[in-house]
Amino acid sequence: MIMAVLMMLCPDIYASAKKAEESPAVQVLTSSKNARKLEGGMLKLARPALKKTPMAVVMDDIDMMVMYSISQKADEEEKQFAQQAINVLEKYNKVSEIDDPDYRMSIYIDNPVGENFSEIILYISRPDPSIMVFVGNFTIGSLKKVGEISDQRRMERRQAKR
C-alpha cells in the first residue's frame, strides 16, 4: 500500500522494482553528494513508530554512513532474505570515520512482511531516524550491481591518486 502511494505521488523520481537497476535512485547509494543534492526533492516519510533492530553499521570511503536493520515483525524467511542483502552491502562498503554528523546518512533495509521476499525497500534517514527519505525498492541482484559500481569507482579514485 505504501509503495503504491509513493509511486503514484512520485512517478518520475522513483523507479519500480522491475527497473531498479536503471533507476537514478541507485546512484544515491554510491554517492552521498548525489544523496544530499536529491534529498530536497525526495518524499520524506515520518515513521516514528517503526521498531527496528540494528544489524550492522558500515561506512564507505566517500562520506556516507550505512546502517542496516531488519523489522522485528519479519518472520524467519524474511530475516534470512534481509540478512543476505546486508551481506551484499557489507561486501562493498569499507569502514571509515566521519566527524561531521551532517554528512551522515542511514540507509534502512525494510524487508516487507508479506508474500514477496524478492525485494527490499531502502530509506535514507538524516539526522532524525523518525524522518526517512524514500530511495527505492531493490532486488539483491540490483544491490550487487550497485556494489560493483561503487567498487569500480573506488579503484578509479585510487589509480587517479597515483
For the regions a language model picked out, list residue spans one by one.
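Bacterial Sec-dependent N-terminal signal peptides
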Residues: 1-22
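Glycine- and aromatic-enriched low-complexity segments, predominantly in secreted/extracellular proteins
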Residues: 15-17, 45-50, 154-162
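Early exported N-terminus immediately downstream of N-terminal targeting peptides
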Residues: 19-80
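C-terminal partner/receptor-binding element of secreted or periplasmic proteins
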Residues: 22, 136-162
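A broad structural signal for short, well-ordered beta-strand segments within beta-sheet-rich domains
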Residues: 59-64, 92, 116-118
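A short, solvent-exposed beta-edge/loop patch
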Residues: 108-143
